[in-house]
UniProtKB/Swiss-Prot annotation:
Its main location: membrane. PANTHER family: CELL SURFACE PROTEIN, OUTER MEMBRANE PROTEIN ASSEMBLY FACTOR BAMB. One of its GO terms (cellular component) is cell outer membrane. It is found in: Cell outer membrane. Gene3D superfamilies: YVTN repeat-like/Quinoprotein amine dehydrogenase (2.130.10.10). Part of the Bam complex. This is Outer membrane protein assembly factor BamB. It comes from Taylorella asinigenitalis (strain MCE3). Pfam families: PQQ_2. The lineage of its organism: Bacteria, Pseudomonadati, Pseudomonadota, Betaproteobacteria, Burkholderiales.
Length: 384
């Protein structure tokens, strides 16, 4: 099946303020969310547990699964550790500040950032504050921690590395910023004493954790079009990192997979696919949700499209995730749509109990899929 893409409604991204006054998009029915038809549901999605943790979320408020627990935060300053088996809250800490991102977990710490351009490190076992430190500016990307370092990418695209023990700054990395860039749910990844992070104009870099030097750099998406808006492109979501390769998705760009050998990256394949969220992966298949609502499956080996579906056009989709042969994706009405991973058929639909859009990334675990809904409820769901 040939995958066809449409021009995207950029208002779903941070470019809203630039385009809001333009008459170009007025009365455009083609950007209206698709109405949902009834489907034959062959599976039942159940709530294993749910618990209220705070005041909603946003694209940067991604929960994390570690040590049989779910760590999460909400904008009102609440940070929690929840038992992944039953949803019981192990601890809840209320910081006297407004948070701008979800959690980073590693080295026995839980890291969050706030509107005052500070990072806070909490003890992962008790929730007590260990240290805090100043950032270059606010950060809406979740931090990441490991190998003795806490990494924060601020909204000026500066990457800073702090010591996990005391928050002391070790190094800083920055590139010249473009005129326009996206504010979306990009995330970092750690592998082999390096952090992989998106920087402006569609680039992805691997930085040595010891000193911040560049191990490698790839241009995952190239600017297109005559105007500043047409030329906006950035890597989105969390890159998929394998022992010998990395795959990325980008806005106004592609899904691209590279092989890594001796710190050199070679493109293996790419497929045009504009997305504002990250990729899903399972059993040698990559899953993407495009900016226009297309959901598609690609072969990891060569990028061949296994299936694609356009039932959810313009429904503001989350990142797709897989749990036990089913693909889950959330939308702007607080619904989870479930696909059969082999056929691409919609087999189930589930409301997360809030009509607000699901903006926090879905989180796959070995127990089910974790959802942080727009009303501040954390839940674990799975299909039976």
């Amino acid at each position: 099946m040939k995958l066809t893409l449409k021009r995207k409604f950029i208002a779903v991204l941070a470019l809203t303020s630039l385009l809001g006054a333009c008459s170009l998009f007025k009365n455009e029915r083609r950007f209206e969310p698709a109405k949902l038809a009834d489907i034959k549901q062959s599976i039942v999605v159940n709530t294993v547990w749910q618990t209220s943790i705070g005041s909603g979320g946003s694209a940067g408020f991604a929960p994390v699964y570690a040590d049989n627990s779910i760590f999460a935060a909400t904008p009102d300053g609440t940070v929690v550790r929840v038992n992944a088996e039953n949803g019981n809250i192990a601890w809840s800490t209320k910081l006297d500040t407004k948070l701008t991102s979800g959690v980073g977990v590693g080295d026995g710490l839980v890291i969050v950032t706030d509107r005052k351009a500070k990072a806070y490190a909490l003890n992962a076992q008790t929730g007590e504050k260990v240290w805090d430190t100043e950032l270059s500016t606010i950060s809406t990307m979740p931090p990441i921690a490991g190998f003795g370092k806490v990494i924060v990418r601020a909204d000026d695209f500066r990457v800073q590395a702090f010591d996990s023990k005391d928050g002391k700054l070790h190094w800083s990395f920055v590139r010249t910023n473009p005129i326009l860039s996206l504010k979306t749910n990009s995330r970092m990844a750690l592998i082999n004493n390096a952090v992989i992070v998106a920087v402006p104009t569609g680039k992805l870099v691997s930085l040595n954790l010891n000193d911040g030097t560049v191990n490698w750099e790839i241009h995952s998406a190239s600017a297109k079009g005559p105007s500043d808006i047409d030329s906006v492109t950035d890597v989105v979501g969390q890159p998929l990192v394998f022992n010998d390769g990395v795959c990325t998705s980008s806005y106004q760009g592609n899904i691209t997979c590279y092989s890594i050998k001796n710190s050199r990256l070679t493109p293996v394949w790419f497929e045009p696919f504009s997305s504002a969220v990250g990729l899903g992966y399972d059993n040698n298949i990559i899953y993407g949700a495009s900016i226009d609502g297309t959901v598609a499956a690609f072969s990891l080996a060569n990028g061949q499209i296994a299936w694609s579906d356009q039932t959810l056009i313009n429904r503001g989709l989350t990142n797709p995730v897989v749990y036990q042969n089913y693909l889950y994706v959330g939308d702007l009405d607080g619904l989870i749509h479930v696909y059969d991973t082999k056929s691409g058929s919609l087999v189930g639909r589930f409301s997360v109990g809030s009509s607000k859009d699901i903006v926090s990334p879905l989180l796959p675990t070995d127990k089910g899929v974790v959802v942080q809904n727009g009303s501040g409820t954390l839940m674990l769901i799975r299909a039976n």
